[in-house]
Design a protein with these regions (language model features):
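Intrinsically disordered, low-complexity terminal regions
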Residues: 2-366
Length: 366
């Protein structure tokens, strides 16, 4: 069959599968028209299979959804939106790359939408209802989007990672099977993953990130920050704001933290250095070491299965409540009660409540 005949047949096939959504004014990108510029086989060279641009200044939102691939969004572009679609074979089907014909055949099982809806850019790839799953023919459809800085997003994938960077506005993103990499965002930031780690850096305003299956690394954050994981460690560096960071399955480490910190773990130790402000820290399965450079409104540190060691300024007025198998603290200008296992009273006239507790270990204050 000639190339012209093959292309005509493919056009006819695609027309049968296009979804017409006039009421929603969704601009559907007829894939054959894009292919006419030169459809290509996909490999690790990372050339997009489909690429489309949208330049209207009224476009302020981005919606991306795919069931089997990764999503990457980068803001800061000056010439509107560019959407690239990538098609790859899944790792378990024994192929590293697909030919043009193979891609066209496998895309028959998907509804692909790339276009606009009101003030939104929409890019989705969904399996058609009723299609049978075939591991040998399964593919991963991913999207890379380049967007202006001031754009709100709603991103969702069930089978890949999400990378999002250089945006201002409300950002919502979730994946069931990959990691989150978040950088240079300002606004309401809400991200979830059920199967990967989180790496977040240089973000501000309101940050809410959670994973059920990986570690969290956070650096250069400012604002109201909430980080939670059920299955990994937490590392905090250069954080400023109201911070909540908890894990059920790993350690907590941090350096250069200011503001208010509420952190804890059920499965590891806590190590914090250069902390300035109010702190609540706890562990059920390890020791706690904290270096405070400046006291805030309170200090509340506890361990159920290890020792507590705190280095902090001793010249402020404090109300001390320390208890453990052994308590060691240099006391000056103190009025209260001192025993081997506890210290209670006022230091320097009283003031900031300082509560240190080790149920199965000692408490040391330097």
């Amino acid at each position: 069959m000639t190339t012209r005949a093959t292309f005509a047949a493919f056009l006819t096939s695609l027309k049968k599968n296009l979804i017409i959504m006039k009421k929603r004014h969704l601009l559907l990108i007829a894939l054959p028209l894009l292919f006419s510029a030169g459809a290509r086989a996909q490999s690790d060279s990372e050339q997009p299979y489909v690429s489309k641009k949208f330049t209207s200044p009224s476009l302020k939102e981005l919606v991306v959804e795919t069931s089997g691939g990764s999503i990457a969004v980068t803001g800061g572009q000056s010439d509107g939106f560019k959407v690239d679609m990538f098609v790859k074979p899944n790792n378990w089907n024994g192929k590293d790359e697909l030919s043009k014909d193979e891609i066209e055949d496998r895309l028959e099982d998907y509804d692909i939408l790339i276009g606009t809806e009101g003030n939104r850019v929409v890019a989705t790839a969904k399996r058609k209802a009723g299609t049978k799953w075939d591991n040998k023919k399964s593919i991963s459809i991913g999207f890379k989007v380049y967007a202006p800085r001031n754009v709100a997003t709603n991103l969702k994938t069930s089978g890949g990672s999400i990378k999002i960077a250089s945006l201002t506005g409300e950002q919502n993103f979730q994946t069931s099977g990959g990691s989150l990499k978040v950088e240079d965002l300002n606004g309401m930031i809400h991200g979830r993953t059920s199967g990967g780690s989180i790496d977040v850096a240089n973000c501000s305003n309101e940050i809410d990130l959670e994973t059920s299956g990986g570690s969290i690394k956070a650096a250069g954050l400012k604002g109201k920050i909430e980080l939670n994981t059920s299955g990994g460690s937490i590392t905090l560096n250069s954080i400023n704001g109201d911070v909540v960071a908890h894990t059920s399955g790993g350690s907590v480490k941090g350096d250069d933290i200011s503001g208010t910190l509420d952190t804890g773990t059920s499965g590891g130790s806590v190590r914090l250095a250069n902390v300035s402000g109010s702190i609540k820290a706890s562990t059920s399965a390890g020791s706690v070491e904290v270096e405070l450079t400046k006291l805030g409104k309170y200090v509340d540190i506890s361990s159920s299965a290890g020792s507590v060691r705190v280095t902090m300024p001793m010249d402020a007025g404090m109300d001390l409540n320390l208890k453990g198998n052994k308590v060691s603290i240099p006391l000056k200008n103190f009025d209260g009660r001192v025993e081997k296992e506890y210290v209670r009273g006022k230091m320097n006239g009283g003031g900031i409540p300082v509560t240190l507790s080790a149920s199965s270990g000692s408490v040391y204050v330097n």
